[in-house]
């Protein structure tokens, strides 16, 4: 199993797909990296040579991936919250940030619904 950027890549997948297991690398960036290093995208991870793996590591080190990228995103959100802008306040309150409606349909961001005790209906008389 090839280990790149602290992630074990699956052995049986094509390297083009396997690289997307690294946080911060999607299919487009994976194709860019493979084109730059000259590795065939259809090669399986288990068939890569040590030279190929070294070239992939060097190419991926040029990007911010995994922990560095997660830390950068967290710092950006924290900066927004510290300066007190609208987006920062929405993050702090756990509400949608990008203008979505909240009267209904914000369940993913707000969490599951809190049940409120309601008025019981009287039993039907016969």
Curated annotation (Swiss-Prot):
The keyword Kinase does not apply. Residues 96-126 are annotated as: Disordered. It comes from the Bacteria. Keywords: Ribonucleoprotein, Ribosomal protein, RNA-binding, rRNA-binding, tRNA-binding. Residues 100-126 have a biased composition (Basic residues). InterPro entries: Rbsml_uS13_C, Ribosomal_uS13, Ribosomal_uS13-like_H2TH, Ribosomal_uS13_bac-type, Ribosomal_uS13_CS. GO terms for molecular function: rRNA binding; structural constituent of ribosome; tRNA binding. It holds the Pfam family Ribosomal_S13. GO terms for biological process: translation. One of its GO terms (cellular component) is small ribosomal subunit. Located at the top of the head of the 30S subunit, it contacts several helices of the 16S rRNA. In the 70S ribosome it contacts the 23S rRNA (bridge B1a) and protein L5 of the 50S subunit (bridge B1b), connecting the 2 subunits; these bridges are implicated in subunit movement. Contacts the tRNAs in the A and P-sites. Belongs to the universal ribosomal protein uS13 family. Part of the 30S ribosomal subunit. Forms a loose heterodimer with protein S19. Forms two bridges to the 50S subunit in the 70S ribosome. HAMAP family: Ribosomal_uS13. This is Small ribosomal subunit protein uS13. It comes from Thermosynechococcus vestitus (strain NIES-2133 / IAM M-273 / BP-1). The gene is rpsM.
């Amino acid at each position: 199993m090839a280990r790149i950027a602290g992630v074990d890549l699956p052995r049986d997948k094509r390297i083009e797909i396997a690289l997307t297991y690294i946080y911060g690398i999607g299919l487009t960036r994976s194709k860019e990296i493979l084109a730059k290093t000259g590795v065939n995208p259809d090669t399986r991870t288990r068939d890569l040579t040590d030279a190929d793996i070294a070239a992939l590591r060097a190419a991926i080190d040029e990007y911010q991936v995994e922990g560095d990228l997660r830390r950068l995103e967290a710092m950006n959100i924290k900066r927004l919250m510290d300066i007190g802008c609208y987006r920062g306040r929405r993050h702090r309150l756990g509400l949608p940030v990008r203008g979505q409606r909240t009267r209904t349909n914000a369940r993913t961001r707000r969490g599951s619904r809190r049940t409120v005790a309601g008025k019981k209906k009287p039993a039907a008389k016969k």
